[in-house]
Design a protein with these regions (language model features):
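S-adenosyl-L-methionine
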Residues: 1-37, 67-100
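Conserved class I S-adenosyl-L-methionine
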Residues: 36-45
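Conserved SAM-binding loop of SAM-dependent methyltransferases across substrates and taxa
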Residues: 46-58
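Conserved SAM-binding motif I beta-strand of class I
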Residues: 59-64
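A short SAM/SAH-binding and catalytic strip from SAM-dependent methyltransferases
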Residues: 98-115
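C-terminal substrate-binding/active-site "lid" region of AdoMet-derived donor-dependent transferases
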Residues: 113-165
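Central antiparallel beta-sheet cores of small beta-barrel/beta-sandwich binding domains
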Residues: 164-232
Length: 250
């Protein structure tokens, strides 16, 4: 007889509870999922998240420890006609490389999220991570959503964007930008012409940096050890390129 999984059945690290379809769709919306993405689902269960992504034309991979669930997922993908986009591998999420994902989905317990967190934070800046129900300890989400309709349990999702690592001193044209970083949140000082200004409202979103200093709004993009950006002058809508935010890390 065909294998039929049971909600709540024990697994290697967590019991298996399927993510409800309405929440899957909301998670995709939060991640701004497109056909250019490569989605990896950690602990893919019966394959529904991966198959849902594949139906949108997205390449997707499910990593699942239970071989019966992997077989079921492959069979479902074939029945749905998405084997060209949906793949499933039997493996341990803590031992399988998922670093090439542009979107990562998970429905794991908080302690497992925390165990995965260092690996996730080392992924490419801009990688989107969406979790059903459970958070990443003190790494606060960039976005939270609750689905009220057609969802009976586990109806909350959290979305993070992996931030670029920018802590340290950046040399600017005639000064420097000193940054301390806690995940996507930043603090520090901008020194121009010998005058230090504390920065505020400072944060990363992937490789994009934004902060206020001295009444000006700065935005930039970080690419490894270089930062390119611009500044709003006061409240004017006019923007100008500022060489002072063309920085290099030191």
């Amino acid at each position: 007889p065909d294998y039929v999984p049971r909600s709540g059945q024990p697994g290697k690290d967590v019991v298996w509870v399927p993510t409800q379809q309405v929440l899957i769709e909301r998670m995709f919306e939060m991640a701004r999922l497109t056909k250019d993405d490569y989605l990896i689902d950690l602990g893919s269960g019966d394959g529904r998240t991966v198959i849902s992504a594949a139906k949108r034309g997205v390449r997707a991979l499910g990593i699942e420890y239970n071989p019966d669930l992997v077989t079921l997922s492959k069979r479902t993908a074939e029945a749905e006609g998405v084997t060209d986009k949906a793949r499933f591998v039997e493996g341990d999420i803590f031992e399988t490389n998922f670093s090439d994902a542009t979107v990562l989905t998970l429905f794991l317990l908080p302690e497992l999220n925390l165990k995965l967190r260092p690996t996730i934070l080392n992924m490419k800046p801009g990688t989107r991570v969406v979790s059903n129900t459970f958070m990443m300890d003190d790494w606060e989400p960039d976005e939270t959503a609750v689905v009220a309709d057609n969802c009976s349990s586990y109806c909350r999702a959290y979305h993070w964007v992996v931030p670029a690592k920018v802590a340290g001193t950046w040399r600017l044209g005639d000064g420097e930008l000193k940054l301390a970083q806690s995940f996507q949140k930043l603090s520090g000082t901008l020194t121009v012409a010998g005058k230090a200004q504390p920065i505020s409202d400072a944060r990363m979103k992937g490789g994009e940096i934004s902060f206020m200093a001295g009444g000006r709004s700065y935005t930039g993009r970080v690419d490894n050890d270089r930062m390119n950006g611009s500044s709003d002058i006061g409240r004017a809508s006019r923007r100008r390129s500022v060489e002072s935010l063309l920085g290099t890390a030191s």
